[in-house]
């Protein structure tokens, strides 16, 4: 099976659509297919830069695209629900059992409240997911109704993820409009996620660094 196959899987796409609708009603930022594609492509890019085989890169793409399907059931423990759903969906394909388990484990371990990197594929997925901080993820609504999650994402005016393979450094560089969100608010929401990225980078034999408005903060 391929990444293209899973992107065209009706059940996967309906789960993503329903999950994003659920999260919208609960007040969460965008978790649409656009987010999942971005996570898949970032995870693949990370592994490619560090010289992993194409087979592993493809598994990371698949896991990245599917990682949020559990939101269709419930936001709480969505990573584990997603893993269970993915396990059944992937049985439809000519995928080896070890590869299926690898994808399921990556999905099941991507949430900072319950998981952590267990192999390079899960590590790349985590970094791809947690570094997707951008203004366009905020749903359209009056700014007066923004909660702290909305403000933090809306305040990010520029985001770049850089990979230095020679020095083995993965760096997230953010520009934050502090008139919208203070640095304290940013770290109140994202510190645990950034620490998860640090653990994921370590799994890849690299160091994770975070820079905000030109200042090194992690």
Residue ranges and their predicted role:
Residues 24-25, 49-163:
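Divalent metal-dependent catalytic cores for phosphoryl transfer on phosphate-bearing substrates
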Residues 28-31, 116, 189:
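Non-transmembrane, amphipathic alpha-helical segments
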Residues 132-218:
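Terminal helices and disordered tails flanking the catalytic cores of nucleotide-processing hydrolases
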Residues 43, 124, 197:
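Aromatic/hydrophobic pocket-lining residues that form π-stacking "cages" and hydrophobic walls in ligand
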